[in-house]
């Protein structure tokens, strides 16, 4: 009994130490009012912004000395409107260049902190890298990463996806040089942590729906899919694109009928694509794991199976406050298309789709889900 009590006390001490350690972490999200104010501060402190401001000194002298105001005005307008664009471009390139020079240290921090796909696990990595980059004069302020999600996204776009897409060792060495062994070690640590998370979803079934027999799919509530879609685009996510579509209708009133039909059809198609992309963008890695686990563990096959998966995921995403109601998927066909388009198709092509993630850490589980679908269709 005493030994058990001592073990429990030790485990509590370890947990409390970790909690205290996490409380000590200070990131820019704790210091700035929003990511926008942090971004403005970053721009203000950048060299490109200072150069842009200094350009106004010779321009003001030119205005005083010149007898013809047209040329100074033209140059001033160019500097005024194009200057901020160049400042932003140079700022982005500077961030990318600074981080690319510190890949080895990035990997060391990942190996030491052992983060998983949970964004909170990346807080320590983000804080340590912020300090390291500033102290080693790789960045001019202490706030390189705004929060843990920014650090995780940088890992994904800088290390995880580019490295995973390299086909052979020579290509990896050519792109990442001496950082290759450190990257391999960091990715190994990350994949092990992701696998632990996956086991919680797939083996222990951490979530199970209650009262699902009363749940209805949107196809049972709406007569047409178009009415469901129009209701969806009325939310805040699609308000600006929808207003843009109405503006396009007004602008195209002078076109001939054929051109107007083609133009508005293309705009509507882009609007639908935007809506489809938003659905996958708001899903975290946890939600994607639950989706794949639900597919793998579904007992029914065919259309009924996908309808059941759609019901479960509609309930799950509503309970997790990802979606405002239980209408994320219209029906089983929509659910199957979603899996095929945003998961299996990306895996097959191994090429990112615009701003969408490759989901590299989910590749083994996507294959498993696709295999279970194939087995069900053959059964």
Swiss-Prot record:
It is a multi-pass membrane protein. It is found in: Membrane. Signal peptide: none annotated. The keyword DNA repair does not apply. Keywords: Membrane, Transmembrane, Transmembrane helix. Pfam families: DUP (PF00674). It comes from the Eukaryota. One of its GO terms (cellular component) is cytoplasm. GO terms for biological process: protein transport to vacuole involved in ubiquitin-dependent protein catabolic process via the multivesicular body sorting pathway. The chain crosses the membrane at residues 43-63, 70-90, 233-253, 255-275. Belongs to the DUP/COS family. This is Protein COS4.
